[in-house]
Amino acid sequence: MALITRSPRRARAIAAALGSLGCPGFAQLPLGFEDDPPPPAQDPAVVLSAALACDDLPRSIVRALPWVVLEYAGMDWEFVLKEARRRGTQNRLGFIVTMAEQLGAQSYGNEEKLTRLAEVEERLFDIRVDREDTLCQESLPESEKTWLRANRPKEAALWGLLTDIDPRQVS
């Protein structure tokens, strides 16, 4: 599996990329200079793929990923799926897409996005890997992993992930 090791610099870069995409909680604060152009937006497919390839990320970044998936449901999914398979992160991606679908179902006007995400989720089910993983939290102590095996949300168990992030709590 081609995952990226822990790196505070990588986490900061992903947080900055989330800000450039307009993600709530990550948007850059204005400096008060009207002539300053906004930072260039990143490709959401690249940001998502890079984040999912990290073995350890702050929970705030992981919780922002469903927003990226829902907000940019028209992203280049062929690239994302290819990268997920190459890096072995298809289960992580599947769980994030599931969370995005539940997030999108909370408000009106997302029908087209939800249809697209359901198609992506179906493709991810076809390439799901039968192994245990974490949701970008590889450094969890074994005692916490044991607890998560017994207490994770059903969606996390479906995707073989050890996480307590509940799709119903993501907003």
Give residue ranges: language-model regions.
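Basic, Lys/Arg-rich alpha-helical nucleic-acid-recognition elements, primarily the DNA-binding modules
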Residues: 1-6
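Long, low-complexity intrinsically disordered regions in eukaryotic proteins
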Residues: 9-26
